Amino acid sequence: MEILKFTIKGSNAFFKKPDVNTYLYLTYGNIHKIALIGILGAILGYCGYNKNKLNYMINKKELKNVSENDFPEFYDKLINLKVAIVPKSEYGNFPKKIQTFNNSVGYASKEQGGNLIVKEQWLENPKWDIYILIDNKQAKVIADYILNKKAVYIPYLGKNDHFADIFDSEMFEENQIEKLYDTKKISGLFMKKDFSVLMEEEDDEEEVEYEELYKYEEKLPIRINKQTNMYELESFICTNMNVANIRNQTIYKVGKENIVFY
């Protein structure tokens, strides 16, 4: 067993929520699995959402199976990756800001003057440690590209305005990895359905250093629905509070971090 670890960051990031109104586009508070495998797909040169699906199916010699609901190539090939995401922030999420754009091309808006004002919510200075379980051929290819600093396309954080910086890549071998089942602390994001967050017990010892507790929770995309091509969401949590492993999930101790793959 091997685990690849690397860090990814950027000045800004924008992981668009599909449930938005006309003028303000919101972002998810963290990178999610679909966005992450999209970045990895770009590194490997796989087709994305905007690539002509017909070309993809011709390359696969399955032209007769073309339909509107075929998944992007990166999703087909990488959705089975086991990943863990650890936000490198004080409270599990990142500051956000609103960025305003003017689109003055004539066809952009039916309003007088043809000027469309668009507002986007961006994450500021996001940074994550990413872990990938090396248990299949695609994972091995990704490890080769990341460790050797190779990429077919430039990776970016949700939008091509936000370039991704990938660094500090390393491989952990089996003798550097420990499997846990009863630990009370999880580093990074985990599915809410797998763990129960416990209330902290008060400690009577005055000398114990106080740690400010936090709990970040958000519904994040975990897969794409075959019929609708829309995100399917799961509730994720990131916390420094104690947790109970209620579904007997395997926890991996890698370096100083306890992580859960999904």
Question: What residue ranges belong to the model's regions?
Answer:
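Bulky hydrophobic/aromatic packing residues
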Residues: 15, 21-31, 131, 239-242, ...
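Glycine/small-residue-rich interface belts in oligomeric ring/scaffold proteins
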Residues: 18-102
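Primarily extracytoplasmic ectodomains and periplasmic/lumenal surface modules that are beta-strand-rich
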Residues: 13-15, 45-50, 137-140
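N-terminal, Lys/Arg- and Ser/Thr-rich interaction peptides
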Residues: 1-23, 34
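Internal, well-folded beta-alpha domain core
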Residues: 75-82, 86-262
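Long, contiguous hydrophobic alpha-helical segments, chiefly transmembrane helices and signal peptides
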Residues: 8, 36-39, 122
